[in-house]
């Protein structure tokens, strides 16, 4: 997990440096110090900032495993973790970002551990599905997990419930439908798509589409297709080479 983070963060950094240079930015701080600040406070750097999830997930797994080793009850972990996230939201504590998102991650990770079997009970699924739809239609509430920010007019507790019920709903739906090869492939190789898609989009946005008079919908189509095909192709090449470690995989 950390190896893909380091490798693809560096590639994102290179892409961001290229953008800064072509925009005429000559402030050395933006090249040397800003990335460090972004990493320390946000968990990732510009150019491939979606990788914050890997650092947060790494911390979540380490902390959760340590707590379970010490026989801390899962329900207690959930309560404490959610309390920290709620306090961060109430007092607008946004830095470092992982204080809140790791806490929320630990809570959701613990809930997943607690509900791993019972979530497929028909009654549990029915209640979760009903709550999910009700919140979506009556009082839409959702949280940006990276920044712990709530949507306008949303309610934090409802947003938590919405996320949990949404996970249960999606898990049940995909458990009972026929496996789709495309989705199965993406799921098995999710790391490839996750670490590469922003780089692919970043390269595409550099191209002078407006000068070429290419319509926006065509550019959007190119982005969608490239985000699916390029990571799959590069991932396949890496996986079947001595560089499979780049994606955190063992060589086949």
Predicted regions and their residues:
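Alpha-helical transmembrane segments and their immediate juxtamembrane cytosolic regions
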Residues: 1-252
């Amino acid at each position: 997990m950390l190896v893909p983070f380091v490798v693809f963060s560096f590639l994102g950094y290179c892409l961001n440096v290229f953008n800064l240079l072509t925009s005429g930015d000559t402030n050395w701080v933006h090249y040397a110090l800003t990335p460090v600040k972004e990493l320390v406070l946000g968990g990732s750097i510009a150019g491939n900032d979606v990788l914050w999830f890997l650092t947060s997930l790494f911390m979540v797994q380490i902390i959760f495993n340590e707590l379970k080793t010490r026989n801390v009850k899962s329900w207690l972990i959930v309560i404490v973790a959610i309390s920290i996230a709620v306090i961060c939201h109430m007092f607008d504590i946004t830095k470092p970002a992982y204080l809140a998102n790791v806490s929320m991650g630990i809570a959701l990770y613990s809930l997943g551990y607690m509900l791993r079997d019972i979530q497929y009970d028909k009654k549990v699924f029915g209640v979760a599905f009903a709550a999910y739809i009700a919140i979506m239609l009556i009082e839409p509430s959702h949280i940006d997990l990276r920044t712990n920010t709530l949507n306008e007019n949303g309610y934090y507790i409802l947003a938590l419930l919405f996320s949990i019920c949404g996970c249960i709903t999606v898990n049940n739906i995909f458990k009972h439908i026929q496996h789709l090869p495309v989705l199965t492939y993406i799921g098995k190789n999710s790391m490839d798509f996750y670490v590469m898609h922003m780089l692919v989009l970043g390269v595409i946005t550099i191209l002078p589409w407006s000068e070429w008079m290419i319509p926006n919908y065509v550019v959007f189509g190119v982005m969608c297709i490239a985000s699916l095909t390029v990571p799959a192709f590069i991932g396949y090449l890496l996986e079947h080479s001595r560089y499979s470690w780049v994606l955190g995989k063992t060589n086949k």
